[in-house]
Regions:
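Long, domain-scale non-catalytic interaction/scaffolding regions in large secretory-pathway
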Residues: 1-152
Length: 152
């Protein structure tokens, strides 16, 4: 059920932050329509089990948000690590990569708060595709996009 999931971490660390385009933290639970911002996901291999191969990062975004496809929009000011392969869909981004022992990678997705309303933002998940003991999940939350001028 939406809003009842819990964070879980097994042999992998996962931190999700939302920031303005200038890199300042932003509260995504209450955004003004038209706001551009980014999701920043940092994944760390604690190093105990060596190199992790074939990790899959799944990010599904709230229905009221739109993904700004940096490749199509010719945007290059949101710098982050580059995955081995990335699949960008209407409401989600799948990133696939390897992660060395003790290594950290940060992936960034540019977003826009497009449609007024309250939406559920699903949790972010990262896992090894062929080893179910390597997984991390950060819970989702409810978010609201308000008309311009409604947020004081």
């Amino acid at each position: 059920k939406a809003g009842t999931e819990t964070d879980k971490f097994s042999n992998l660390e996962l931190i999700v932050n939302y920031k303005t385009l200038n890199g300042n933290p932003i509260d995504v639970t209450n955004l003004e329509q038209g706001t551009d911002f980014m999701a920043e996901v940092t994944i760390k291999n604690p190093g105990v089990r060596g190199m992790y191969r074939n990790l899959a990062l799944s990010q599904i975004f709230a229905s009221g948000w739109e993904i700004r496809n940096q490749r199509l929009d010719n945007i290059n000011y949101v710098k982050g690590d580059v995955p081995t392969y990335q699949d960008i869909r209407d409401d989600r981004v799948y990133s696939y990569f390897d992660l060395g022992a003790g290594a950290i990678k940060t992936f960034k997705v540019l977003l826009n708060a497009s449609y007024n309303g309250t939406y559920y933002l699903p949790g972010v998940n990262c896992e090894a595709m062929y080893d179910n003991s390597v997984t991390a999940h950060v819970s989702g939350k409810w978010v609201t996009v308000r008309k311009q001028g409604e947020i004081q």
